[in-house]
Curated annotation (Swiss-Prot):
EC number: 2.1.1.148
Reactions catalysed: dUMP + (6R)-5,10-methylene-5,6,7,8-tetrahydrofolate + NADPH + H(+) = dTMP + (6S)-5,6,7,8-tetrahydrofolate + NADP(+)
Organism, as annotated: Clostridium perfringens (strain 13 / Type A)
Chain positions recorded as FAD binding sites: S56, R80, H81, R82, Q88, N174, A175, R176, N180
Lineage: Bacteria, Bacillati, Bacillota, Clostridia, Eubacteriales
Family affiliation: Belongs to the thymidylate synthase ThyX family.
Start and end residues of each ThyX domain: 2-219
Database matches in InterPro entries: Thymidylate_synthase_ThyX, Thymidylate_synthase_ThyX_sf
Classification via SUPFAM superfamilies: Thymidylate synthase-complementing protein Thy1 (SSF69796)
Name the record gives this protein: Flavin-dependent thymidylate synthase
Keyword Methyltransferase: yes
Cofactor(s) in the UniProt record: FAD
Pathway: Pyrimidine metabolism; dTTP biosynthesis
Active site (UniProt): R185
GO-annotated molecular function: flavin adenine dinucleotide binding; NADPH binding; thymidylate synthase (FAD) activity; thymidylate synthase activity
Length: 245
């Protein structure tokens, strides 16, 4: 099951952004700015920044997520968002005695497709186990110790695992990169799995920075759809989902 947890974030993110932006136009230092910066003042200034499209100050705050129950297909898409830091469960160092896998809903709901899919997953596990044992025995016979032999075996045996293989990942993005991520991955044209994750992430960041992320979501939430002829035609539904109106 897909789980998203907001592990950490910059304390008082909206005040931090407002203070950083105000510093650009202030003769005093950040201590004086923060001392006189009320919640209402920070909100007003942040709204002004966002309305002007002045985005560089929001790079000062970051958000760290822990995600579980996702496929390697998802993480291959995720790491294309390059202004971020990623730490993913390793198939090289973690032996998968019984690997978990993600079944897409379209396959789950088709009895024949599901059987074909599960047969392939079970076949991959069987092949992995046999390759690990075969290579491990070979390396031991060559004089390599048992533990390093197993490690050497599993790093090659993992090549049989499919994109469906379940994985876990921790990643950090600054707010500007996160906004860009939401524009692309909350879009109806994004694949179902990463879109579901993005929706959960939006819900998490809105709890701690509601002003900053009030228009978070696909590009069409706060402006025109950039997809041209590929537009999904669901602008009204998307704005209802993300803005509640």
């Amino acid at each position: 099951m897909l789980k998203v947890k907001l592990l950490q974030y910059t304390p008082e993110p909206e005040k931090t952004i407002a203070a950083a932006a105000k510093l650009c136009y202030s003769p005093v230092g950040v201590d004086d700015i923060l001392e006189n910066l009320t919640d209402e003042g920070a909100e007003k200034f942040l709204n002004m920044l966002m309305s002007y499209g002045h985005m560089s100050p929001i790079e000062h705050v970051s958000f760290t997520f822990a995600v579980e129950g996702v496929s390697r297909s998802l993480t291959h898409q995720l790491v294309r968002h390059r202004i971020a830091s990623y730490s993913q469960q390793s198939q090289r160092y973690v032996k998968l005695d019984q690997f978990e896998y993600i079944v897409p809903p379209a396959i789950e709901n088709d009895e024949v497709a599901k059987k074909l899919f599960i047969d392939q997953m079970q076949g991959a596990q069987k092949a992995y186990d046999e390759i690990v044992e075969r290579l491990k025995d070979k390396y031991i016979s060559e004089g390599i110790g048992e533990k390093p032999a197993e490690k050497k075996a599993i790093e090659d045996a993992r090549y049989v695992f499919p994109n469906a293989c379940e994985t876990k990942i921790v990643f950090t993005m600054n707010a500007r990169s996160l906004m860009n991520f939401f524009h692309h991955r909350c879009c109806d044209r994004a694949q179902w799995e990463i879109r579901t994750m993005a929706e959960k992430m939006v819900n998490e960041v809105k709890k701690v920075a509601p002003i900053l992320f009030k228009n978070a979501g696909p590009s069409c939430v706060a402006g025109p759809c950039p997809e041209g002829k590929m537009c999904c035609g669901k602008l009204k539904e998307m704005r209802t989902l993300y803005l509640g109106k």
